[in-house]
Structures are given as C-alpha cells and as structure tokens.
Amino acid sequence: MAYSPINKGSSFQNNVRYVGTGNSPLAITGVGFEPDLTWIKKWIGSTNEAHMLSDQVRGYNYRLTTTSNAEQQAASNDLLSWQSDGFTVGSDNRVNQSSSYTYAGW
C-alpha cells in the first residue's frame, strides 16, 4: 500500500465550482479551509478568460495570469478576500460574469 504523509488531502487542497452572478461581492464557500492560493478559471461560457491566480503572499489585490509573461498585476475587483471556508470575488468577468457562466476554483 502506498504511503502518503498527508492523511486527508482535502484539508489542504480542494476544488469548487460556482456560477457567476455579476453581483459583487459573491462569497464562494465550501472549500473547507481558508485558502493561501486561489486559482480561478471560467470553465463554461462563450468567452475565454485566462486563469487568474492570487496568493496570500502578494495579497488578494494582486494577480498572476497564465496568458501573460508580465509580472503581477494590480487587481481591484477580482478576488476581494479570503474567509475561513472559501473566498469572495468581485464583479470582474474573470471571476464573476453574469448570465450563468460557470467557474472552477482550486
């Protein structure tokens, strides 16, 4: 039997799926812990958006994107905060577009 030093991986990494509303703020819960890194991607929708990454070292008001080789970028309405069971997003289309766009968060 394989050995893993992590008994319960979902205590450290979890995936959530949510539907955008376009309304800010939108709380995303059910993660099970306060994330240190949030990776969000529009999963279902007619427009394609880059993967958007934020971490607690840079702070929620900065992001990295996977479609650019640029440095971190200031973000004012993407990720708004982290909570004990998830995170809160603003109304930016990268993270919360209305019309039933579906997003995946890691």
Whereabouts are the PLM-identified features?
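Surface-exposed molecular-recognition determinants
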Residues: 1-106
